[in-house]
């Protein structure tokens, strides 16, 4: 394939444009550089920037049927071969476990043996690892190595996020053993994070597996084996997600049971209190009818005697409840 002039991929508002040196390093692309398979170019764009959007819509370096995908229309992870190039959509993890995971960060890329065009709207933190390796001279040497390193970084971030969720589940389980109910909504958020992760990471694992099995001309056999290892590692993470989802369901049932037991104890206590004071309530009501005068009303110590009788009656009922093992 013929080389590409650096001026053809010069986008003023690009996030960055790197020219790989084929030895693990990279430098900023210049207009007079020649892009070929030995020195591929990585162009990273924010498709919401006007110059980047204009370049994506007009450049002859991209097939017409990938322009919309790179401009943000593609959502779920997938891979499509288009002649000598490949269109790939990936999802990555940004942020912490306290954030809502409704929208994972999407990265779309089209690549062949000479050119890598990646687009995003929000920053992809996993790419910082690849950029740092290139700056230190320990990064990928070609397009195949670049793709493997990016997928490896994305999987590392996903694995770390899954491990954080797993640790939170262990903490919740320990608190439940001590009869401590988690704050309202925390378990629902955790479960939602797990479900959203599984929704997007399952097709992403399939993307990795397909990249490992496809005979792409710019990927070596060793890179395919590494890609298969990444797919297997993400698969183990998905198994961990399934386990965590099942554990959250068990915790939800346990929380409901703990709350029901707490309510039952309170109801039982109120019932015993009502049973203790029911005889005294009956007597005070009976003595207060006043149809024939209050019994003992003319006796000097009548009220005191009545109070003593109530105390004895309440004590007797309490003793009977204790003897019957109701208290």
From Swiss-Prot:
Entry superkingdom: Bacteria
Cell compartment(s), UniProt: Cell inner membrane
CDD domains the record matches: ZntB-like_1
Annotated Gene Ontology cellular component terms: plasma membrane
Catalytic activity from the UniProt record: Zn(2+)(out) + H(+)(out) = Zn(2+)(in) + H(+)(in)
A Pfam family: CorA
Keywords assigned: Cell inner membrane, Cell membrane, Ion transport, Membrane, Transmembrane, Transmembrane helix, Transport, Zinc
Annotated TM spans: 274-294, 301-321
Ranges of the Cytoplasmic topological domain: 1-273, 322-327
UniProt key word Oxidoreductase: no
Topology Periplasmic: residue spans: 295-300
Gene Ontology MF annotations: cobalt ion binding; cobalt ion transmembrane transporter activity; magnesium ion binding; magnesium ion transmembrane transporter activity; zinc ion transmembrane transporter activity
Lipid bilayer topology: Multi-pass membrane protein
PANTHER family (alphabetical): CORA FAMILY METAL ION TRANSPORTER (EUROFUNG), ZINC TRANSPORT PROTEIN ZNTB
Family membership noted in the UniProt record: Belongs to the CorA metal ion transporter (MIT) (TC 1.A.35) family.
Summary of the function given for this chain in its UniProt record: Zinc transporter. Acts as a Zn(2+):proton symporter, which likely mediates zinc ion uptake.
Full protein name: Zinc transport protein ZntB
Taxonomic lineage of the native organism: Bacteria, Pseudomonadati, Pseudomonadota, Gammaproteobacteria, Enterobacterales
């Amino acid at each position: 394939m013929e080389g590409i002039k650096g001026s053809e991929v010069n986008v003023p508002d690009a996030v960055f444009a790197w020219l790989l040196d084929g030895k693990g390093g990279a430098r900023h692309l210049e207009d007079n550089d020649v892009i070929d398979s030995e020195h591929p170019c990585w162009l990273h764009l924010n498709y919401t920037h006007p110059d980047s959007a204009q370049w994506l819509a007009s450049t002859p370096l991209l097939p017409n049927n990938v322009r919309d995908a790179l401009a943000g229309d593609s959502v779920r992870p997938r891979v499509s071969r288009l002649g000598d190039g490949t269109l790939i959509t990936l999802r990555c993890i940004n942020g912490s476990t306290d954030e809502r995971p409704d929208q994972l960060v999407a990265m779309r890329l089209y690549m062949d043996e000479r050119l890598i065009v990646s687009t995003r709207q929000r920053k992809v933190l996993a790419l910082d690892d690849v950029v740092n390796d290139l700056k230190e001279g320990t990064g990928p040497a070609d397009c195949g190595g670049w793709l493997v390193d990016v997928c490896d970084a994305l999987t590392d971030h996903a694995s770390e996020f899954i491990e954080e969720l797993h640790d939170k589940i262990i903490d919740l389980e320990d608190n439940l053993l001590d009869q401590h109910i988690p704050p309202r909504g925390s378990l629902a958020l955790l479960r939602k994070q797990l479900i959203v992760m599984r929704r997007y990471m399952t097709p992403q694992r399939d993307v990795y597996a397909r990249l490992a099995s496809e005979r792409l001309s710019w990927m070596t056999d060793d890179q395919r084996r590494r890609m298969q290892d990444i797919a297997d590692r993400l698969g183990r993470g998905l198994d961990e997600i399934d386990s965590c989802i099942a554990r959250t369901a068990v915790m939800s049932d346990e929380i409901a049971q703990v709350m029901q037991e707490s309510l039952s104890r309170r109801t039982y206590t109120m019932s015993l209190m009502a049973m203790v004071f029911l005889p005294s309530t009956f007597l005070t009501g009976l003595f207060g009818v006043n149809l024939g005068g209050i019994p003992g009303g003319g006796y000097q110590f009548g009220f005191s005697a009545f109070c003593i009788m109530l105390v004895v009656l309440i004590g007797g009922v309490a003793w009977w409840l204790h003897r019957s093992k109701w208290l």
